[in-house]
Amino acid sequence: MHKQVEIFESDAKEKLVVAVTMATGRQGIGVVKELNQTDKYQIRAITRNIKSTKALELGRLNNVELVKGDLMDPESLKKAFEGVDVIFGNTTPTKGWKLFRGSIVRSYEMEQGYNLINQVKTAYEKGRLNHFIFSSISKAKDPLKNDPAPGHFTSKWDIE
């Protein structure tokens, strides 16, 4: 059982608007559902396909708004981030983990990260964005070993 943690404080009576990228992915679904445990947040669940089974499941939750957005499409992110207070951003090395071999992994995730960061900056400059959370990886490599880290680890580090 999870202990409910208040991650954002607000003196305003209106709900904080929290955008969650890749909302239908494993991590995104968990974030959306956890935030939805209280009535304090309006959650903007950003996904490539708002008609997918997972998206429709999220859309049935209170306080959840489905928004079409793709980390590979900066304009869709710009629209999705308008008027948000908080952005939870995560990236993926592949589209559905099917292309998990070779350099495409790194370049795909780096492009997502570049688009995400640029649109977060735009949202901050033009709106009311106060918090940005980027889901990354830490300590995934043993510093005592000389093994190279996998590309999908180093790409997250470089996005940071």
Predicted features along the sequence, with ranges:
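Structural motif
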Residues: 17, 85-86, 131
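N-terminal Rossmann NAD(P)H-binding glycine-rich loop of SDR-like oxidoreductase domains
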Residues: 3-41
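Hydrophobic residues within alpha-helices
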Residues: 27-31, 116, 159
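Active-site Tyr-X1-5-Lys
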Residues: 150-160
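SDR active-site strand-loop-helix element
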Residues: 21, 46, 90, 134-137
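A structural signal for isolated positions on well-ordered beta-strands in alpha/beta enzyme cores
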Residues: 42-44, 65, 131-133
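NAD(P)H-binding glycine-rich loop region in Rossmannoid oxidoreductase-like domains
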Residues: 48-123, 140-144
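Active-site "gating" loop of Rossmann-like NAD(P)-dependent oxidoreductase/epimerase domains
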Residues: 7, 138-151
